[in-house]
């Protein structure tokens, strides 16, 4: 397989068209590393990230769909001998339940901002040793995208990426140019019946139903939740699927519209210009994701090495270019092409961002929201 074919397979994995297993089977990480070493030798000479000592043959990362650059993982494996094994999840509730159950096997994971205080309260994550993360520079990050990684004066998580939650639609199929969550739900019940996807994630599924009524994305008010539930139950028979990995169905035409995170919107629009990403005019979610290490992780040296490697600005630039999520690191922004910095999907106008809300910690463990989501999925 030549480099062109390898890159094609890598893109297919990144956009969700093939699984990680299929990617490895078709290419092999050895070949991947060879390509990276030849084409991007700078990746293999980053500031100390664990290459000076043995860190084992693998590192287990729990993360989200379509959220990493396979070439960077190959470069990391080539330099350290540790291959990255991914466990992919579609919600923070899933991640929390897995850690609470014990035996996750994770060495690091990617929680969202509003969940970190809960992980700390439950004793599920360790404070980070910044001496082992020389590529992390707190001064390079905007405060709002990193402050929730700090609990009681201790740093428990460092920023990975930030983004928004909107919806994506196929403009060849949906001609009305929707701009609101109200229109999203109306289309789901009407002209796009059978072709719409909703996240398998209570924060966004319930939150964006709430927004269509003008309520807070994080509402726990019983009446407001009842209104959201009524809407969700009305829509449920019309949905194509409830799934947080929606790129494959949007790409193959089974779905015409889906709740969508920034990077998925960027990837879809980049490859298929008819895919349009929209932030509902009522508002919605602004979020930031972090790297954290679970308490008792089996391979902490490998976890620190991988985090530090990915925080290298040159490496992080390649991450952003591949997945389309802003890093929040000014050093990385300075390396990105102007076309990306001007992309309104990645960097929405200030007035659009001002209408968005960060998720609230109380929603993660709210029994009312959990039960509502369970009824919605079971209907």
Where are these regions (language model features)?
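Short beta-strand->loop
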Residues: 126-137, 157, 273-285, 294-297
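Mature extracytoplasmic/periplasmic domains
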Residues: 294-353
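N-terminal secretory signal peptides
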Residues: 1-22, 46-47
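Early extracytoplasmic/lumenal segment of secretory-pathway proteins
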Residues: 49-118
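A bilobed periplasmic-binding-protein/Venus flytrap-type ligand-binding module shared by bacterial periplasmic
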Residues: 168-173, 212, 288-302, 318
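A structural signal for short loop-to-beta-strand junctions that line the ligand-binding cleft
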Residues: 104-108, 126-130, 135-167, 194-196
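Ligand-binding pocket segment of bilobal, Venus flytrap-like solute-binding proteins
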Residues: 197-201, 205-209, 213-280
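N-terminal export leaders
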Residues: 6, 18-40
